[in-house]
């Protein structure tokens, strides 16, 4: 039995090492990460997260009592609240009805709520009144719907994030009070995840809203039950969101030389980008739309706007890609004798994932009945999309199977109201509660989480420095 267990751990560690390597998508990245990956493999071997998960998930009546309370809240009230929010979708930054329902529920359970944090009208922070100091446990909620062509809709099941997170927060807060145990619970209401600008979590992070948290958790819909490998990464590449705002001068189109055409400048921008693509590494993604292009065909457009997401697997080379696009905009303005304003409005960056949280959370999801289990860990990525919070504070995003449909579809919205969605939400709520219980009650576990997170954060810094040395810019001589 012992031999089989050791072999299993070695196989798991090898899988984690290989999966971590997949986070580096280009040859340059893989070479820069070579030494870092060796150090990470040594770290993961010393932590032995699978053995840690086996120990923590063993029978524990106190934990199961707290988990049962979270399930009771879901069954009696919070699944119905999830359905209500699903049926009344609100897009980002105008989620007034949704946050009122969530905040009212938190107030009824002894949370003190402050709304409008970080200067965002529908962002809020709810702190449990009887805070007993560290450890400080954070729970992130989202509640915005997607923008559809005919209506807003909860095709990413953000409608369930609030109820799931609240069930865990209330259950663990009540336990800490009942047992007079140390610890505080804070719920963060984060608007507009599907929209930027602004990037809500980054704005809140920069305003200090998340300061003092030891661990943060959240849930999210998924077509399968999974967890990330340890390391750093993001789901959708590193992103710079940039608007290029061109101004010209109006004139009658029959005498267009009397004006300066801002729309032509935008068209030149797209042409310029296409002309320099061969100078940019092929993994880059430069995706833009024209959001303003003039009001009438008989008037020279004096204002035009292009909105771009500029993506690359790492943020170091992303800066070179961004310079190509910025210079393409400046060249377009120069060629058309217009002016351009470059407005950088948002970023998404690599976050950090740790096996000490991921393996334990994954074990709990399976324990509480998760379906469609993905055996191997996925690529490393932060527990939230911006990287601002998840590169500074350890955490985990729970993702039990809650839909048979693809994300961002009407079918996923329908699943939020059905058996598959409700089952997945119950699994997430129970697993999240169990993990928070372990973090609150096991100082040695908190120390292991911190050790892993701090080490990976240091390795991430070393990796970025290696990339800076690798990504040289050719020297161009004077003509």
Regions found by a protein language model. Name each.
Residues 85, 106, 126, 139, ...:
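Divalent metal-coordination and catalytic microenvironments
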Residues 70, 74, 82, 86-89, ...:
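Sec/Tat-exported extracytoplasmic proteins
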Residues 146-160, 175, 179-301, 408:
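Histidine/acidic-residue-rich, glycine-tolerant segments that coordinate divalent metal ions
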Residues 1-5, 186:
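Positively charged n-region of N-terminal signal peptides that target proteins for export
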Residues 8-17:
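Bacterial N-terminal signal peptides
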Residues 26-184:
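Acidic/His- and Gly-rich active-site-bordering loop/insert found
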Residues 264-267, 271-479:
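Metal-dependent amide/peptide-bond hydrolase catalytic core
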Residues 21-25:
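Boundary at the C-terminal end of the N-terminal hydrophobic targeting segment
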């Amino acid at each position: 039995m012992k031999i089989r267990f050791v072999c299993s751990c070695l196989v798991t560690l090898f899988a984690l090492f290989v999966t971590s390597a997949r986070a580096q998508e280009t040859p340059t990245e893989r070479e820069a990460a070579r030494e870092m990956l060796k150090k990470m493999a040594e770290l993961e071997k010393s932590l032995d997260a699978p053995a840690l998960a086996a120990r923590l998930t063993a029978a524990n009546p106190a934990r199961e009592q707290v988990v049962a309370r979270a399930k009771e809240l879901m069954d009696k009230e919070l699944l119905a609240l999830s359905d209500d929010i699903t049926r009344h979708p609100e897009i980002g930054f105008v989620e007034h009805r949704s946050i009122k329902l969530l905040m009212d529920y938190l107030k009824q359970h002894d949370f003190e709520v402050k709304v409008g944090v970080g200067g965002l009208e529908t962002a809020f922070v709810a702190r449990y009144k009887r805070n007993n100091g560290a450890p400080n446990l954070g729970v992130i909620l989202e509640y915005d719907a997607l923008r559809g062509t005919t209506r807003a809709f909860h095709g990413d099941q953000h409608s369930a994030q609030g109820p799931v997170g609240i069930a865990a927060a209330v259950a663990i807060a009540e336990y800490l009070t009942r047992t007079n145990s140390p610890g505080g619970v804070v719920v963060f209401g984060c608007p507009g995840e599907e929209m930027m600008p602004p990037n809500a979590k980054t704005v809140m992070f920069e305003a200090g809203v998340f300061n003092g948290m030891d661990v943060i958790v959240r849930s999210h819909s998924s077509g399968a039950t999974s967890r990330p490998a340890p390391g750093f990464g993001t789901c959708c590449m590193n992103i710079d969101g940039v608007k290029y705002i061109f101004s010209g001068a109006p004139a009658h189109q029959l005498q267009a030389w009397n004006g300066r055409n801002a729309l032509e400048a935008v068209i030149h921008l797209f042409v310029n980008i296409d002309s320099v693509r061969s100078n940019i590494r092929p993994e880059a993604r430069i995706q833009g739309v024209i959001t303003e292009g003039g009001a009438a065909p008989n008037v020279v457009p004096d204002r035009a706007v292009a909105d771009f997401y500029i993506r690359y697997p790492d943020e170091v080379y992303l800066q070179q890609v961004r310079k190509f696009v910025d210079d393409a905009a400046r060249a377009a303005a120069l060629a058309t004798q217009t002016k351009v304003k470059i407005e950088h409005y948002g970023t998404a960056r690599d976050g950090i994932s740790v096996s000490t949280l991921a393996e334990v959370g994954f074990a709990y999801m399976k324990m509480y009945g998760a379906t469609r289990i993905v055996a191997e860990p996925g690529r490393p990525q932060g527990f939230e999309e911006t990287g601002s919070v998840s590169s500074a504070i350890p955490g985990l995003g729970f993702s039990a199977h809650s839909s048979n449909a693809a994300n961002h579809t009407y079918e996923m919205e329908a699943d939020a109201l059905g058996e598959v969605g409700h089952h997945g939400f119950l699994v997430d709520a129970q697993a999240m509660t169990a993990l928070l219980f372990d973090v609150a009650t096991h100082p040695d576990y908190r120390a292991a989480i911190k050790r892993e997170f701090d080490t990976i954060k240091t390795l991430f810094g070393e990796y970025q420095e290696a990339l800076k040395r690798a990504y040289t810019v050719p020297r161009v001589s004077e003509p």
